[in-house]
A protein has these predicted regions:
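Amphipathic alpha-helical scaffolding segments comprising HEAT/armadillo-like alpha-solenoid repeats
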Residues: 336-345, 365-376, 396-408, 428-438, ...
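Autoinhibitory propeptides
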Residues: 1-22
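Structural detector for internal amphipathic alpha-helices that build alpha-solenoid repeat scaffolds
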Residues: 327-334, 352-364, 374, 385-396, ...
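Subtilisin-like serine protease catalytic core
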Residues: 19-124, 140-142, 195-198, 226-233, ...
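Short inter-helical turns and helix N-cap capping residues of alpha-solenoid HEAT/ARM repeat scaffolds
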Residues: 349-350, 379-380, 411-412, 442-443, ...
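C-terminal subdomain of the subtilisin-like protease fold in secreted/lumenal serine endopeptidases
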Residues: 142-145, 279-344, 348-360
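Substrate-binding/access-modulating region of protease and related hydrolase catalytic domains
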Residues: 22, 28, 92, 115-198, ...
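Extracellular S/T/G-rich loop segment that most often corresponds to the catalytic His/Ser-adjacent loop
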Residues: 36, 52-65, 193-279
Length: 487
């Protein structure tokens, strides 16, 4: 191993003791809507009939089968994301450096819904699959839907009301039936869109693999703010890096653990917590559970993101009180520009209204390039991201120089990412002097662009290894920086 084994995920979530392998999540069904599929692996065989794969095919027929009966995929990467989610939820106990690691809800029933995500017609297939599960899977007692790719095929920068999203439309019936939808809030500030208020949106933070909360810090590229309806997202934060699961990559590698990460991992852990609580407190409603997790989370000091860190023990302690008050559901107003003049709304004092208007005008192709440039000076990063992403790559050498100037003065990481993405297109090797300094930017997409730029010229430049870990950014960039200093 090239790193110390982190604390068990259950400790990092604030459990006072490890989840019981036989009872945590018992009687609770979780539908996992994944971004690819799931592959068969011996590490999930212990789930036996408690794990199913429901597939919706292009002709809208539905099939269901046990994961254990599936053939091993020839493509070893296919189904990996789904497998990691299942392992984080339900892997068997393993002893690592005198600490027991176990899935958060190993007794739950897991239904993996493969609906051909991120391909044309996915919304209709997702709706069909959920309808089938709710009709035919009564014995599964579905209480939770875990979605790690809710955005579907939407442009993730263009801001719209969330009701227009195909996933939101497909899951509307399930939400109305009181099923808790838990979804990842997004991995980088490069994007604008965030989940609807009806979902429990999960962001992440850096816990350095430790349960000790004094060591926790914000993730520097964490997306947060108002979604297309004007509602603040995310609701809650969970660890997002170095989430331990049993090693699944090669059975003879000698490795004992693999690592899950990103807000897909964070959301999966929270789904496990929800299943654990539903099994302990069967009378809990989805709305009440969501409220309790947020209300009894812990603020993260030094963070502008208002979402708290999850703390399971705080929530359980409150639930065990006899005098707990009743929770009253609140309905928040939604921002909409449907009845407004776009050319008036584009100058609104509300940045969400400006972003919604700019999105419509851009999609209608009603703005000149000069007008788009004017929106790169907007006070809102949401608006600037839409403008810069729409500009795309520089049109000529003069505009390319302007990109570099704007990049230098841009304070928001996501906007910098879009300038860098534009500059990456047709970038000459002679520009190396402009690229080096961005190898340690806090924004993932900026560093990704630097890495991709260097990869275009491997015979000329050292390479930059990509990392999501903010503590490793400068370490990964050190060889490149030392090479450049020695020139």
């Amino acid at each position: 191993m090239d790193r110390a084994i982190p604390d068990p995920t259950w400790k990092r979530l604030g459990f006072a003791e490890q989840p019981d392998f036989h009872t945590s999540g018992l009687g609770v069904g979780i539908v996992i809507i994944i971004i690819d599929s799931i592959k068969q692996h011996h590490l999930v065989n212990h789930l036996n009939t408690r794990i199913k794969c429901v597939a919706v095919h292009e002709n809208m027929t539905v099939s269901v089968r046990d994961i254990s009966s599936m053939n091993r995929e020839e493509d070893n990467r296919k189904g990996e994301h789904g497998l990691m989610s299942v392992l984080a939820l339900a892997h068997e106990p393993i002893l690592l450096e005198e600490q027991i690691h176990v899935g958060i809800a190993p007794a739950a029933t897991l239904i993996v819904l493969d609906h051909g995500a991120f391909t044309t017609g996915e919304g209709e297939r997702l709706k069909k699959g959920m309808e089938w599960i709710l009709e035919h899977g009564v014995e599964w007692n579905i209480k939770i839907i875990l979605s790690t790719g809710w955005q579907a095929l939407d442009n993730e920068v263009y801001l719209k009301n969330t009701s227009e999203n195909s996933t939101v439309k497909a899951l509307a019936t399930a939400v109305q039936q009181g099923i808790l939808v838990i979804c990842s809030n997004g991995n980088t500030r490069l994007n604008n869109i965030m989940p609807p208020i009806q979902y429990l949106a999960v962001g992440g933070y850096v816990d350095r693999g430790k349960a000790d909360r004094s060591l926790h810090v914000p993730f520097p590229d964490e997306p947060y703010g108002r979604n297309g309806d004007g509602h603040f997202r995310p609701d809650i934060l969970a660890p997002r890096l170095h989430l331990t699961i049993p090693s699944y990559e090669t059975e003879d590698s000698g490795q004992r653990v693999s690592f899950y990460g990103g807000t897909s991992g964070s959301a999966t852990l929270v789904a496990g917590v929800a299943a654990h609580l539903f099994s302990q407190f069967p009378s809990l409603s989805a709305e009440m559970l969501r409220h309790l997790l947020v209300e009894h989370g812990e603020p993260l000091e030094g963070n502008d993101n208002l979402a708290p860190r999850i703390n399971v023990e705080n929530t359980i302690r409150y639930m065990n009180r006899a005098d707990k008050p009743r929770y009253i559901t609140k309905t928040l107003p939604m921002i909409s520009i449907k009845n407004q003049n776009l050319y008036s709304a584009i100058h609104s004092i509300d940045d969400t209204e400006r972003a919604l208007s700019l999105t419509v005008l851009v999609e209608r192709d009603e703005l000149s390039r000069e007008e788009l440039w004017s929106f790169t000076k907007d006070s809102s990063a949401i608006v600037r991201k839409i403008a810069v992403s729409t500009l795309g790559e520089p049109m000529n050498e003069q505009e390319r120089k302007l990109y570099w100037v704007h990049l230098m003065h841009e304070t928001e990481g996501g906007v910098r990412g879009w300038y860098m993405h534009g500059l990456l297109q047709n970038a000459p090797k002679e520009e190396i002097h402009n690229w080096i300094k961005w190898s340690t930017d806090i924004n993932w997409s900026v560093r990704w662009c630097v890495s991709e730029y260097l990869a275009q010229y491997p015979e000329y430049f050292p390479q930059l290894e990509k990392t999501q870990d903010p503590d490793a950014i400068h370490i990964k960039a050190l060889p490149l920086r030392e090479w450049y200093t020695a020139l």
